[in-house]
Amino acid sequence: MYLAKHFLIGAVVYAFAGTALAQRVELQPAPFVQVPFQVDGNSPVSWKDGQLQFFTSDGTPVKAHGADQFALSQPTRIVVDRSDHLPMWIESVWTDDDGTVYGWYHNEPGGVCPDGKLTAPRIGAAVSYDGGSTFYDLGLVLTSPDPADCSAKNGFFAGGHGDFSVIPDRERAYFYFLFTNYGGDVIGQGIATARMAFEDRKMPSGAVWKYFAGAWAEPGLGGRVTPVFRAETSWQRADTDSFWGPAVHFNTSLESYVVLLNRACCKPGWPQEGIYASLNPDPGNPAGWSEPVRILRDIGWGPGYYPQVIGLGPGETDTEVGEGARLYVHGRSKWELVFTKGDFFISGADQPLDPSAPMPGDRLDQTSTGRRAGR
């Protein structure tokens, strides 16, 4: 897969081209909007009775609603039936045909390290029968096999799995997880993937399988991973260089899955080096993700984490998007992304090309180093 980049006046265009039609992602300026309350982590959305349901968390999950993403109410606290996996961040949701909302959460347990400064996140599942106002915890589904390293210098995590998103495939055969592995040897750190059979969504604990060494055969609870995008520098170091926090959606215009990534590099404090995008027509083929391409560097505010899209078309969400979407970074947006497909030539520039940006390259294979991830 090859990449070409050009710049229009007021827009930045990236084109992903392979044997099929070129796939183009265009970044355009848009009027500034901001979610009118605090957000943290990926903030998923769904629809209920013609109203957009917006979920976010700051350790306690909350939900707002509105006619669309630009008219949100103030949030109300989500009731969770048990407290043993608090604090939690609900980072993905999916609504079944009968209105049942399945959610997946990032949990940061206490007591991981003696001084209490570091934790090791885990990923769990929950279900709601009232549109997301109340969730029933279904238990943990993804945990790390590696012991906590309380000497880690990244400032947050001693290991663990977290900062993730979940999406079903188009055939409703599997739910796919893209998550960040913060622990163990650096060769296994970075963005990893796992999947769960669609029919196991009601009883997910023990039903998720991680991708490792070419097979979906490692258990979600304690199994090993082969990263899709491997960390360049370990999360145990202060100067980590790694992608993190994937936000994935299916793009109906491109007929492809698109993931947005943070990249922490290469100083203490998880500085945001940029926001990256990668495409894959089939999440069941982890080697099919294209080399991540930086689409945004100068965000305009800090720390600039948590990129995600919300589609602009009727009924679109953060996981199903058409030709146009708002790009949010930490709950603020001053950009639209336009996704198109077709044969065309791309050239030109309205700003200097960045020599550190990824160059055109082939599809990643299992042994590729990929590139980066972060918090």
Language model features: what each stretch is:
Residues 1-9:
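Bacterial N-terminal signal peptides that target proteins for export
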Residues 9-10, 20:
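Cleavable N-terminal signal peptides
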Residues 10-11, 80:
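Intrinsically disordered, low-complexity segments enriched in polar/charged small residues
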Residues 15-17:
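N-terminal signal peptide c-region/cleavage motif recognized by signal peptidases
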Residues 22-86, 94-153, 170-174, 179-240, ...:
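Beta-rich carbohydrate-recognition and catalytic domains
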Residues 42-44, 90-92, 163-165, 245-247, ...:
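Conserved beta-strand position repeated once per blade in WD40 beta-propeller domains
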Residues 159-160:
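Aromatic sugar-binding surface patches on proteins
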